[in-house]
């Protein structure tokens, strides 16, 4: 795997923003050891704009940073879950064939974005919940409750914040796209 300098910088910036933004002081505690993090919007944005590899690494490294600075130790199961969320949301530009880059963000594109956010949260944090239950003997009902709360909360947060950000990105790209066509 050969990453360009630009990609490495994007991953570092995204992971730092997601990692620091994921700290408990910026989140909303919702359940046992479970916090709704507004930083999920950062993960979704980097995933949509730069693809699955950047999304995975921003989620993985960023969650690792959160866990290290929060002081509760690194929970690799949840670090992996955040990486998977970023990976799945990162397929958005491939599925839409880069419509956002052309300044297009339709209702169908938004629905796909929300679906990928939900799917990413269910698969990513579903893996985390399963692995917590198997590896750490966490009560199954607890990890399933965490999964349901986080998947629903994160999807809602990503949908609301993401709608405004991606609409603005599309508008900006459309202006740039129109300038290129005028040349």
UniProtKB/Swiss-Prot annotation:
It is found in: Cell membrane. Its main location: membrane. Keywords: Cell membrane, Membrane, Transmembrane, Transmembrane helix. It is a multi-pass membrane protein. One of its GO terms (cellular component) is plasma membrane. InterPro entries: ECF_substrate-spec-like, UPF0397. Pfam families: ECF-ribofla_trS (PF07155). The chain crosses the membrane at residues 8-28, 41-61, 69-89, 110-130, 147-167. Disulfide bonds: none annotated. Belongs to the UPF0397 family. NCBIfam families: PRK13661.1. HAMAP family: UPF0397 (MF_01572). This is UPF0397 protein PBPRA2239. It comes from Photobacterium profundum (strain SS9). The lineage of its organism: Bacteria, Pseudomonadati, Pseudomonadota, Gammaproteobacteria, Vibrionales.
